Amino acid sequence: MACVKFPWELMEEILYRVPSLSLSRFKTVSKEWNTLLNDKTFIKKHLALVRPQFRLWTNSKVYSVDVSLNDDPNIELRELPLDIPYVIDHRTTNFLPCNDLLFCASWWSNKAVVWNPSLRQTRLIKSGEEHFRFGGIGYDSGRPGKGYHIFGHSHSRLSVNGNTSKFIKRFYITKFESNAWKCIDDVSLGENSIGGDSLDNNNVSLNGNLYWTTNSYDTDEYLIQSFDFSKEIFKIFCVLPRKKDSSDIPVLSVFRGDRLSVLHKFKGTNNMEIWVTKNKINESVKAVVWMMFMTVSIPIYKDSKPSYFINDIYEKRLVMCCSDENGKACVYIVKDQARKKIQLGFHVSEFSHCFYDPSLIPIPSETSGQKISNS
């Protein structure tokens, strides 16, 4: 049987639609294919067409959940290799997407891992501080090529007048290009809400900056705080639409790739509100305007935190990964008043999850001792 050779343009169009995990294996087909799959233009076009995913972790397995939003929405559940070094217990690990990489940090550990699941690349990050907690990853938006930075904080006891002491929270950053950590701020605990209780487990990365929710000690309002990696400063970004006395801890997500969304679940009910920012998030924004996107009633497990994304290209849809009222993993797809629940089919009572856009963007190569592993 004669071998049929496809036109190169047609081959590119096909490869744009191949899942990232499969594409990474095609780099060994030929030098021409390897050049194409590493090309920045190809990576950008592929990312624009990739289907959204959730990542789920148990203590023994990792799953990807591909979501297809056609006329009859469905999901595809796939088990992935569990090849993240130093991530032992998902219950004490935070997973933060940033520019299509995943930042995996265990609580009060001096180790974290930057991971690209599609390329099966990992990079270990270490801190020499005791009682250290990683807060997230971002980059200097003013630099070409995205100079990634890692952010975290430590707690220590400081003696005062020789006989009393107080706890000090110290914030640090390090650049990917080096192993050197720099202290950027000292804060006395109880005197300032910088960081807040949600810095480590309710943050998002957008345009290189970190955003997270906290609450004002004075007004009981929920706030979004941010850290600008290019200027190395904290600031109060905005006040959220709901107060602490009416809703559980709000859940942030990225909307349209350049805006923020927030999910408020009302205490003691299944009722939720999803709000989105009207304008793009950038330095020119002086006042943040929030718009109601959707109200919905979804029964989820008590005190559980959902992961979600919004799709409004053609119709308003909310896609949420969570534990249902019985503690079982599921995905809800909501459109107008229609709500579809899809059980994920594995039976574990505890798991972690996050929304993630898979991509072929490689982890920046080492320059000073930080090693990249290709599993």
UniProtKB/Swiss-Prot annotation:
Effect of residue 361 to T: In strain: cv. Bur-0 and cv. Wu-0
Organism the protein comes from: Arabidopsis thaliana
Protein name according to UniProt: Putative F-box protein At1g12190
Pfam families reported for this sequence: F-box, FBA_1
Occurrences of domain F-box (ranges): 1-46
